[in-house]
């Protein structure tokens, strides 16, 4: 799936890049795999509700 049409994927990647964080760093903080974070950012899957809350806290949004 192309993330250009997925605002959630776009926002997740933008927030991570804005903070200069690696996929590995975000994955470690959220206790998920690097592949899971990449899938969220590519629009291939969505984080569950608990991970959405953790993402909001991590990115302070």
Segments from the language model and where they lie:
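DNA major-groove recognition helix of helix-turn-helix/homeodomain DNA-binding modules
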Residues: 50-61
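Residue-level signal for the short linker/turn that defines the boundary of a DNA-recognition helix
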Residues: 10, 20-21, 47-50
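Short, conserved catalytic or interaction motifs in soluble domains
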Residues: 42
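A short, Lys/Arg-rich alpha-helix, primarily the initiator
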Residues: 1-18
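Short alpha-helical DNA-recognition segment
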Residues: 20-39, 54
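Short alpha-helix boundary/capping motifs
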Residues: 6, 45-46
């Amino acid at each position: 799936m192309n993330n250009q049409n997925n605002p959630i994927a776009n926002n997740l990647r933008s927030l991570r890049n804005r903070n200069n964080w690696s996929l590995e760093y975000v994955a470690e903080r959220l206790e998920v795999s690097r592949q899971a974070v990449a899938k969220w950012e590519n629009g291939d899957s969505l984080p569950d509700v608990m991970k959405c809350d953790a993402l909001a806290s991590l990115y302070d949004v």
